């Protein structure tokens, strides 16, 4: 779609938000809440673990405790002899889920670039909701308890949940160009934290009726969200006849370049020929999806993936273990620990938005991330010595979330979109979902390993050594960032030198 030059100039003068339409807002909100619902279902499972554990173990503190009954009556519907065994199995389910989720991300990214992402996302949301219903609600209604069945269902749930992130990041990358992407994606990446809060609210509101209703409510809301995505989401501006974000940016660059050229020049013949061929060709060429190995070989993909594996291990360890750490280390009530842990998410939301905005202004991502990671080392050391004071703990926790959750949100969203739409693949290939799946899949492998290592270190040593382990992983993240900083700085100096020569 062609717009007059004067209209384009007026739109550029109106400011940053003038480039976006209500279609951009709809894509932003629909993808935001779709992934929030997927994350809410994960958080709901974490919030009902105590109730699930008590249901899976025999109870000797009820009204019939002193009535002699057969052993089958006491233990007929139980999976484990004690709460400790049930808790270990719940931890195993977390690890199984994350490994299945990591494997699924690699597959889902490839599928997302080859099929309609609206259909893939709808299928993932609705089918994942069904598995949640089967896992937590149907089994309880039927009084069916089986460890192998639970493991299989949770593996399937991890695979289905993995369809969400590559698709929503790719759709956002289609709608929002690199200009301002750091700020927009930094704000949008708060969807996971909002999902955590939503999941906690949904679970706590019906938990008094039984944990199965927490699964029922969460699954129902997620299934309804999948239906809304099917009928309401537009995956790309091209579906509405609008210019693609990459095309729009290239058009603006071409206009700026053309404005500096004379109307009559010696090299116009070749340009006229190429322009004529473009204008006369009205055939829309559908880009082919890039291969998995090709995506891995794109500049920056492997380094960012390895960096994210180390960083997501720390970030997800806070997600899974922070409430337990507060209860275990400071002897606070579980409900108070759950409420206090929200401050880590709040810090991550603010950190992702602010750091994304700064990276937009600098036009470089890796230096901003590296500075944040270096400050995260100090924040982790400070939080490991946090006093037994809730206000001070929440303050230091939010700072830690700012410097850890912020970079994590940026790598998984804005930087993944940058990598999938870089010049090497733009206009000829589709790589956004594949690259996002590679980055987040590698990160999820690191997160899954963390769920095994954190309790192992804590039981063998103490919580202080867990924080030393976190600091080591942050340092490893920084090491993987060094080549990226060198490359971005070299490119920045080259562009600055060329701009001076043009003047």
Swiss-Prot record:
Listed GO MF terms: transmembrane transporter activity
SUPFAM superfamilies tied to this protein: MFS general substrate transporter (SSF103473)
Lipid bilayer topology: Multi-pass membrane protein
Function per UniProt: Unlike the other SLC37 members, seems to lack glucose-6-phosphate antiporter activity.
PROSITE patterns assigned: MFS
Entry keywords, A to Z: Endoplasmic reticulum, Glycoprotein, Lysosome, Membrane, Sugar transport, Transmembrane, Transmembrane helix, Transport
Location of the protein in the cell: Endoplasmic reticulum membrane; Lysosome membrane
Top-rank taxon: Eukaryota
Glycosylation site list: 62, 71, 275
InterPro entries per UniProt: MFS (IPR011701), MFS_dom (IPR020846), MFS_trans_sf (IPR036259), Sugar_P_transporter (IPR000849)
Transmembrane regions listed in the UniProt entry: 20-40, 87-107, 119-139, 152-172, 183-203, 214-234, 300-322, 342-362, 367-387, 395-415, 437-457, 466-486
Cellular component, GO, one term: endoplasmic reticulum membrane
Predominant localisation class: endoplasmic reticulum
Record flagged with keyword Lipoprotein: no
Protein name: Sugar phosphate exchanger 3
